[in-house]
């Protein structure tokens, strides 16, 4: 897989009863994401981050422009995996079955599910049902499920929101460990610039709607990272001192 090229001329919403344009969500949006890159996206509330993910995933094709990888192929044809703000586990399936459900019949479901659940420290919880797990453990299952399909593109939409900070930090570390074992291209939406600095190769800051790319900032700290809070704060301060309104979607 080559770079992902995102070139959205316009994404607008209509009232289809009277065909009146109601909202231009994204306009003149141009972004390149390299193969294997961890790219975080930050923007003000309501700027169209989830809309952007839906376009990239091919869930919404009503826009002008192109989203492709390589020369001719559409990104929506890639093998993709998703992780959302909630784990979205199936309550009638146990932990192992929740991972196996996304695998195809030609794969060794038992071996693959146990492998990824073991990486997440859940080997003793294979027969537990979601309602017996904490929120953090449910998200570990969701992470294992996301990587089990060996996706070419992994899309994460604020996956660690609402968690206590120690639990969220553990999951961020586990995400990076999984990614190191099975590299893939990641698009990660977050409101937390500290989280983005810790995880990302590149942070993309979006404007107020209609959304476009305001600025791309590379995080060049070598991996595996051992970034304490002071290190993250120094990088954050450097970014915000040069771009003091960037989190509000302005330069």
Predicted features by range, described:
Residues 42-44:
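The feature captures the beta-strand-to-loop junction immediately N-terminal to the Walker
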Residues 64-76:
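Conserved ABC transporter NBD signature motif
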Residues 128-131, 149:
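Conserved signature/switch motifs of ABC ATPase nucleotide-binding domains
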Residues 154-157:
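Catalytic Walker B motif of ABC-type/P-loop ATPase nucleotide-binding domains
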């Amino acid at each position: 897989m080559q770079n992902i090229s995102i070139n959205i001329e316009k994404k607008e919403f209509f009232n289809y009863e009277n065909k009146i344009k109601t909202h231009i969500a994204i306009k003149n949006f141009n972004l390149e994401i390299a193969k294997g890159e961890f790219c975080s996206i930050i923007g003000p509330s309501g700027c169209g981050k989830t809309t952007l993910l839906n376009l990239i995933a091919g869930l919404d094709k009503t826009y002008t422009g192109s989203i492709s990888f390589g020369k001719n192929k559409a990104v929506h044809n890639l093998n993709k995996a998703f992780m959302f703000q909630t784990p979205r586990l199936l309550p009638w399936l146990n932990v192992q079955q929740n991972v196996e459900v996304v695998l195809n019949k030609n794969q060794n479901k038992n071996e693959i599910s146990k492998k990824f659940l073991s990486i997440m420290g859940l080997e003793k919880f294979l027969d537990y049902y979601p309602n017996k797990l904490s929120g953090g453990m449910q998200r570990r299952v969701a992470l294992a499920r996301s990587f089990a399909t060996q996706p070419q593109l992994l899309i994460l939409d604020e996956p660690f929101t609402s968690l206590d900070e120690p639990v969220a930090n553990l999951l961020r570390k586990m995400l990076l460990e999984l990614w190191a074992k099975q590299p893939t291209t990641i698009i990660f939406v977050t409101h937390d610039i500290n989280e983005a600095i810790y995880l990302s190769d590149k942070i993309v800051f979006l404007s107020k709607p209609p959304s476009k790319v305001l600025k791309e900032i590379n995080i060049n700290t070598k991996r595996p990272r051992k970034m304490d809070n002071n290190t993250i704060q120094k990088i954050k301060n450097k970014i915000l001192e040069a771009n003091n309104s960037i989190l509000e979607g302005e330069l």
